[in-house]
Regions:
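Active-site segments of SGNH/GDSL-like serine hydrolases
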Residues: 23-24, 64-98
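Surface-exposed acidic, glycine-flexible loop patches that form ligand/cofactor-binding
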Residues: 2-13, 70-73, 154, 158, ...
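Conserved SGNH/GDSL esterase-like catalytic core that processes O-acyl groups on lipids
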Residues: 1-53, 57, 61
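Structural recognition of the beta-strand scaffold that forms the well-ordered cores
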Residues: 15-21, 25, 78-83, 112-115
Length: 179
């Protein structure tokens, strides 16, 4: 797929990525475990830090592989992993997804979680009546963009040391501290 190839093009690398994957994987399923033969995976057992090609065939293994492949080309890139919002249905698939992303962020460098599951309003029936029409409507996407901007700003302000040299990511002018 050309879009996937473009993602890993060494001439198209970015300083940061927002990754929001998993929603389509969960459609029609009770939880992530249904899709991965009962195993969402675990960062400690399913991520091979030395060779991402050896990651386990689980949600965690595949998700981490995307990050690790980019990190191999651009080691200081920042990643913002987006959890699914809580739909207020009591279905624990969103919580399973959020837990998996927190594990990945804790295990890999330069990864942070935009936790819509715990920190955004519930995307319940009332919310959906205002901000959805099948998929999100324009107001829903605008509101979500504001969540992302606010959350990323919060992450940066609470991790200033990690972000002080982002302007040099991808350049040959890497400060000694990033070396």
């Amino acid at each position: 797929n050309a879009d996937i190839a473009h993602l890993f093009d060494p001439f198209n690398l970015k300083q940061g990525y927002i990754i929001a994957l998993g929603v389509n994987d969960l459609k029609g399923k009770n939880n992530l475990n249904d899709l991965y033969e009962g195993n969402v995976g675990s960062a400690k057992t399913d991520i091979c830090l030395e060779d991402y090609n050896k990651n386990a065939n689980t949600f965690v293994g595949w998700y981490a592989k995307i990050i690790q492949r980019i990190q191999k080309m651009q080691p200081h890139t920042k990643f913002f992993l987006v959890t699914m919002p809580d739909e207020g249905t009591g279905n624990w698939k969103e919580e399973s997804h959020a837990k998996a992303l927190h594990e990945i962020a804790d295990y890999l460098n330069n990864c942070y979680v935009i936790d819509l599951y715990h920190e955004a309003p519930k995307y319940d029936e009332e919310f959906r009546s205002k901000y959805f029409c099948g998929h999100m409507n324009a107001m829903g996407y605008l509101l979500t963009a504001h969540y992302f901007m606010t959350y990323i700003d919060w992450i940066i302000r609470h991790n200033v040391h990690d972000f002080r040299f982002v302007q040099f990511i991808g350049s040959d002018k890497i400060p000694f501290a990033l070396g």
